[in-house]
């Protein structure tokens, strides 16, 4: 018996023994969700309009080579649904999350998924391990509200786990309270737009001359990539899969007066999101909606291996930088995004009193 077979057999026995009869015959309506690539998020209700449902999602693992900067640096990436990060899935507390995980025959490695929001050993990883050419269906109950990451955890041990995550295999789930988001006093909070920013550290090996190396296959890249990863010094720290993925023409959009919810995840390293010229009106820094949000933050902290959420109402037009406020990572390694906000300037909030001019000598005292 192989290790993989033993793990799956033990997990299956545990599942059968622990599963009550009601879970085998859920009398709930089903909703099939068409996922979209980040930073966008699929349509969803902020306040649940009916009782719990079975929310159906489909995630397809894809191994592919991608370009991660304007220099043409290539990564042998591993992804969910072809994007880094994988899609954000939105449900409500009490819903059942039913995920079909597909590993196409065109892939070369086993993959699975660990849901941080789920309750059960390995977050479902032992029950979702699929070889190329296989698919599996996992269902778990959303019992805790908040934003939670998911990631690949093949086998649960050894170098495959950090390699798959550092190659792009993570995403997030948002479990909303059934009656929606609220402030510390219980007042309802609403957002007009939502964006999902997935921060990712990459470790691209270099040759003897310091140039980034390119590999034909994932297996070819494995040994050198692991050596680079063990030094814990990323060559790139990016938002949504590559340098400038969310800047310029790809900037996230908003209008003055609109409230935007920003979901931010990092599966590996700590991060310090900061909206340049804006604030976190309400921030769930640990990502858990059962905790009251902090208010009026200038910079917030996302622990490695977690996700957080921040709500902000834009009051001025312009281009807002959204950065990891480790400025080396923001400006040198790529952790920068933009919000492009349209509207009318409020001169009461900010105005240039005098335009730049030559320095004037100060009058001497009599």
Which residues does each predicted region cover?
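Bacterial N-terminal signal peptides that target proteins for export
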Residues: 1-10
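Sec-dependent N-terminal signal peptides
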Residues: 9-17
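Sec/Tat signal peptide C-region and signal peptidase I cleavage site
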Residues: 19-23
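Copper-binding active sites and cupredoxin-like electron-transfer domains
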Residues: 24-366
């Amino acid at each position: 018996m192989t290790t993989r077979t033993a793990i799956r057999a033990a997990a299956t026995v545990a599942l059968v023994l622990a599963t009550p009869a009601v879970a085998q015959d859920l009398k709930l309506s089903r909703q099939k969700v068409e996922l979209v690539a980040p930073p966008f998020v699929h349509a969803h209700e902020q306040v649940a309009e009916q009782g719990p449902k079975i929310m159906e999602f489909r995630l397809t693992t894809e191994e592919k080579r991608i370009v991660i900067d304007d220099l043409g640096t290539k990564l042998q990436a591993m992804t969910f649904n072809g994007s880094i990060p994988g899609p954000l899935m939105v449900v409500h507390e009490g819903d059942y999350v039913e995920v079909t995980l597909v590993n196409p025959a065109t892939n070369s490695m086993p993959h699975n998924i660990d849901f941080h929001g789920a309750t059960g050993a390995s977050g479902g990883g032992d029950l979702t391990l699929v070889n190329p050419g296989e698919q599996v269906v996992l269902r778990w109950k959303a019992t805790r509200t908040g934003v939670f990451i998911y990631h690949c955890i093949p086998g649960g041990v050894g170098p495959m786990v950090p390699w798959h995550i550092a190659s792009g295999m993570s995403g997030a789930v948002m479990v909303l309270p059934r009656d929606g988001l609220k402030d510390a006093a219980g007042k309802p909070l609403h957002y007009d737009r939502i964006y999902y920013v997935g921060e990712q550290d990459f470790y691209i090996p270099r040759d003897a001359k310091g140039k980034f190396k390119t590999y034909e296959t994932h297996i070819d890249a494995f040994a050198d990539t692991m050596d680079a990863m063990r030094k814990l010094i990323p060559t790139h720290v990016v938002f949504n899969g590559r340098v400038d993925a969310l800047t310029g023409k790809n900037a996230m959009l908003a209008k003055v007066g609109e409230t935007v919810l920003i979901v931010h995840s990092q599966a590996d390293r700590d991060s310090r999101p900061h909206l340049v010229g804006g604030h976190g009106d309400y921030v769930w820094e640990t990502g858990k909606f059962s905790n009251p949000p902090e208010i009026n933050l200038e910079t917030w902290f996302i622990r490695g291996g977690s996700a957080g959420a921040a709500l902000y109402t834009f009051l001025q037009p312009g281009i807002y930088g959204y950065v990891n406020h480790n400025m080396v990572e923001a400006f040198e390694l790529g952790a920068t995004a933009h919000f492009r906000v349209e509207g009318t300037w409020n001169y009461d909030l900010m105005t240039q009193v005098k335009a730049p001019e030559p320095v004037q000598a100060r009058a001497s005292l009599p």
